[in-house]
Design a protein with these regions (language model features):
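Cysteine protease-like catalytic core of ubiquitin/ubiquitin-like
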Residues: 47-114
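Alpha-helix initiation/capping motif
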Residues: 18, 38-41, 81-85, 126
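Secondary-structure junction/capping motif
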Residues: 17-18, 103, 119
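Catalytic-core signature of thiol
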Residues: 95, 113-128
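Cysteine protease catalytic domains with a Cys-His-Asp triad
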Residues: 1-66
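Short, solvent-exposed coil/turn linker segments
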Residues: 35-42, 75, 115, 119
């Protein structure tokens, strides 16, 4: 008799993520993303929604993921939003190290927190 073994597929959380990686991880986590954009496109986003915004220089291949939920901005480095992003609230808590590579997953954690109306980031406030 043959025994069938089912293997659960996992999606590893990577530090450096692409927009495609973030969409896949969001789907697995049940996080709704209205759109992923680069900073130049962020000024034209509707006021309400769940967005991930890539901050990067014009001649750069790499950047830093941030997010916006309605009028609240999140940056895992605790930096206020660039002037093109109109938000009334933003975080000032730094969740990742200066050279950390997990800004994309942190953005998803923020959006999940807002969409489920639970402060899941609170556990990370004082880990020092």
């Amino acid at each position: 008799m043959r025994k069938i073994i089912r293997v659960k597929r996992t999606l590893p959380i990577k530090g450096i993520t692409s927009a495609g990686d973030l969409y896949k991880l969001a789907e697995r986590l049940g996080v709704h993303i209205d759109k992923i954009v680069v900073l130049d496109e962020a000024g034209s986003l509707p006021e309400k929604g769940s967005y991930i915004i890539l901050l990067k220089g014009p001649n750069s291949d790499v950047g830093h993921w941030t997010s916006r939920y309605n009028d609240e901005y999140f940056d895992s480095m605790g930096v206020r939003p660039p002037s093109i992003i109109k938000c009334r609230k933003w975080n000032d808590v730094q969740y990742q190290s200066t050279y950390g590579e997990y800004c994309g997953p942190w953005c998803l954690a923020f959006l999940l927190s807002k969409q489920q109306n639970k402060d899941i980031l609170k556990s990370f406030y004082d880990l020092d």
